């Protein structure tokens, strides 16, 4: 039995293409892998606090006493990291906002990236500590950006996930959604076909 963690990060709730596709992924995965456990975390419905000068102090080893706000941030960081490490497959629904990931997803990463916990520095450079996972990124875009200089989502996510130890990453693209109903329908159809292929593999 595998454990699957789905991270939603769109501010558009049910209108979101990436949310709809991640819901489709869950439906297909449950159909093919009925014994697996699936956890869904909606980072827009339940937002992660923005990392600031106070909160960053909670995530660095120190003997200094923590403020109540820092204690809450550290407890949440511990919870998010434990959840991430406990799952085998990580599904990230990542819409493109202004060429990159959403603030909601970035806030999550800022609390998950902790030296000595999810990565460490060695003589040979940084080493990721979240290993043995597979990641599937479902990314939706209004325009066409794949393989071009305006796609900052793909390289950023590949780099971040690899940095913490997740190197088996597959991407599902839904592009051209803002180009009209016909293009949006094709984007959804192509993305669902890609999801079907991943789920059945």
From Swiss-Prot:
Reactions this protein catalyses: 2 a quinone + NADH + H(+) = 2 a 1,4-benzosemiquinone + NAD(+); N,N-dimethyl-1,4-phenylenediamine + anthranilate + 2 NAD(+) = 2-(4-dimethylaminophenyl)diazenylbenzoate + 2 NADH + 2 H(+)
Cofactor note as given: Binds 1 FMN per subunit.
GO biological process, one term: response to oxidative stress
GO CC terms: cytosol
Knockout mutant characteristics: Deletion mutant displays reduced viability when exposed to electrophilic quinones.
Pfam families according to UniProt: Flavodoxin_2
Reported cofactor(s): FMN
Protein's name in the database: FMN-dependent NADH:quinone oxidoreductase
Gene encoding the protein: azoR
Keyword set includes NAD: yes
Record text on activity regulation: The azo reduction activity is inhibited by dicoumarol.
Induction / repression: Expression is induced by electrophiles, including 2-methylhydroquinone, catechol, menadione, and diamide.
Organism lineage: Bacteria, Pseudomonadati, Pseudomonadota, Gammaproteobacteria, Enterobacterales
Natural source organism: Escherichia coli (strain K12)
Superkingdom of the organism of origin: Bacteria
């Amino acid at each position: 039995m595998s454990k699957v963690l789905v991270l939603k990060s769109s501010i558009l709730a049910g209108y979101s293409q990436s949310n709809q596709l991640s819901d489709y992924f869950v439906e297909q995965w449950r159909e093919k892998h009925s014994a697996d456990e699936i956890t869904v975390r909606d980072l827009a419905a339940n937002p992660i606090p923005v990392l600031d000068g106070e909160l960053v102090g909670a995530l660095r080893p120190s003997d200094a006493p923590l403020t109540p706000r820092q204690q809450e941030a550290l407890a949440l960081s511990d919870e998010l990291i434990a959840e991430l490490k406990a799952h085998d497959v990580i599904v990230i629904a990542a819409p493109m906002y202004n060429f990159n990931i959403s603030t909601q997803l970035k806030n999550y990463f800022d609390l998950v990236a902790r030296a000595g916990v999810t990565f460490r520095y060695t003589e040979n450079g940084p080493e990721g500590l979240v290993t043995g996972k597979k990641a599937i990124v479902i990314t939706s875009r209004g325009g066409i950006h794949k393989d071009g200089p305006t796609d900052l989502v793909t390289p950023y996510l590949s780099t971040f996930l690899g940095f913490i130890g997740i190197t088996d990453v597959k991407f599902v693209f839904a592009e051209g959604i803002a180009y009209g109903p016909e293009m949006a329908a094709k984007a959804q159809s192509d993305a669902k076909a890609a999801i079907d292929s991943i789920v059945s593999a």
